[in-house]
Amino acid sequence: MVNQGQPQPNLYDKHINMFPPARARESSHKLGNANSDRHGLPAQNIVPAPYPVDDSIVELTPAIPFTSPSSSSSLSLPLSALNFTDGNADGGQLGTPVTINSNNGMDIFNSKPTGEIGYANNGTNSTGSRYELPFNFSSTKESLGSPAVQDASISSGNRISESVRDNSAPPPYEESESRILQEKVYRTEEKAPIRPLNNNPVPPQKINQPPTGSAKTDDNGSSGGEDKLSSYSPEALAFYQVYKKTITDSSKFTPEIQMQWCETLLTYAFNEDFISQYNINAEKLKRSLKPEEMLKNQKVILEHSFKVLTKLITLKWPPAMYLMGTLYSHQPYLPIKNKNIVIKNDEKALEYYCKAAKLNNSDACYRAGVCFEYQRGTSSLDPSPTKEQCIKKAFQYYQHGAEVCSNSACMYKLGMSHLYGLNMQKTDVLLAIKWFDKAAQKGDSPQTLYELGKIYEFSVLPPEIQNLLFANGIRKDSQLAIKYYQQCAKDFEYPLAQWKLGNCYEFGDLGLPVVAKKSIYWYSKAAAAQPKGNPMAMLSLSGWYLTGAPNILKPNNKEAFNWALKSSKCSDGKLARTEFALGFYYEKGVGCEVDLDLAKQYYQRAARMGFRKAVDALRSLTN
């Protein structure tokens, strides 16, 4: 397959706008098999958030799909047939291929708060009495998909200071005294007797949690006790373990334990299988709940999660502030299906990120930096900062996150800033490589590995960057570039690196041999990546279907057209080569009916992006 047209700027070469995901939570915070969103194509329009959506890292099981969504035809070989004669298997066992030819001041972090954050008291000053056990709340029916929690204390139009304030607004959930009075005691060993007519005092009943091994049944038909755990689902068992740990910690209110409980509640509130079978007390119900009962159960769980989160924020627990920021930005790190539990507010998201960053939360440093870099949530700051001031703040947050908090995402951003220059930031290629190396050593930054691969591939970088690298003694090293690409593609399932390996095996770049099976394999991995796949890999599969590969893949025009169409949808029509390919297919009737009007439309899209072949094709159609 031959490249068409003159070399064009590659939208993916300089991926400074692509950011690493939030760091993985500690293993103790992993919540069983909680379901997460999976988005298919076509790509949905998502409201811009304070930081870009990242590339998900998802294990591709079962095997890679070799058909486009709109067709039932498939490759002429199963995935199991992709075993290579050289003894390597790219499906996880492929070794590193062998080539053929051998600031400013940090004043925003130095000041300290002078008092407590002025959040709502929530009915008590105790850390134990209100949080000893989960509560049951009376609730009204709400849509299962939209249990919105409002914050009426501060409007989004109010101007705020970007620094940490002692009297900032409370989180979205704020309970009233009447709500507190409505709460029910968790459990008693037996129901309290009716008061006698003679008004003689009755000794109070002792309130206990269920003894280990008990299997009591309450009025709602729920049953608990460890003798019933054998019937629990794996997800419910994971919930029960967190619940049990939380109950044990109720008198201490240890932030780490309570934070895990809060995250668990937020996650499980949107797990329909769980909320239809279990309640907040980790008890399995005798029957599945009806939809309206599930709504009530969901609201109970959500309300309590915000009670715990509010309490943690009043204690100035940085992860809680960071979590609140992610909820306000509608980009939570938790697998929350409905992000509208909190009204989107970029200004308040930035405020919470800054609070958490000031307390050295590494993820908050990164997100605060991104917010300032792209001026998300900065319009309400007083005074309103200029673009240059925002860039300066962003660099400060990245620097703090990298140097103080050892955050690999911040190291990556510093590397990109020094390599390409962040607005007015001076380029320093050696310092960029230093930060990339540090991030790579932490083992959780695939973007860094990809950038290092590009640096040692050399020719894909802008000429001015190549000159700077050459002047500092950095030369092209194909073997080192392949090593970084291979590690990034295998260890992190990073779609760009997978596409790159497919491209190298297709055209024999970086000293690799032309191997059709390996090329198709890596393209397929990248095209099937979550959340929406890589559009360049989809276009490359279109090319393989158009030409075929002897003894590997039969030509299939329909599949060629479908993969090109999928690439266009995935890239939102912003990949010039894809738009040109669709114009060609419609003009020639490859895998579709001839449609010259559509052909012109696609050619025009590609031409507007500077694709020379499209300009020539338009002239040919009009003559």
Curated annotation (Swiss-Prot):
GO terms for cellular component: mitochondrion. Signal peptide: none annotated. SMART domains: SEL1. Residues 152-161, 206-215 have a biased composition (Polar residues). Sel1-like repeats lie at residues 318-361, 408-444, 495-531, 576-611. There is a cross-link at residues 184, 191 (Glycyl lysine isopeptide (Lys-Gly) (interchain with G-Cter in ubiquitin)). Residues 141-230 are annotated as: Disordered. The keyword Repeat applies. One of its GO terms (biological process) is positive regulation of signal transduction. The keyword Metal-binding does not apply. Residues 176-193 have a biased composition (Basic and acidic residues). It comes from the Eukaryota. Keywords: Isopeptide bond, Repeat, Ubl conjugation. SUPFAM superfamilies: HCP-like. Present with 98 molecules/cell in log phase SD medium. This is Activator of C kinase protein 1. It comes from Saccharomyces cerevisiae (strain ATCC 204508 / S288c).
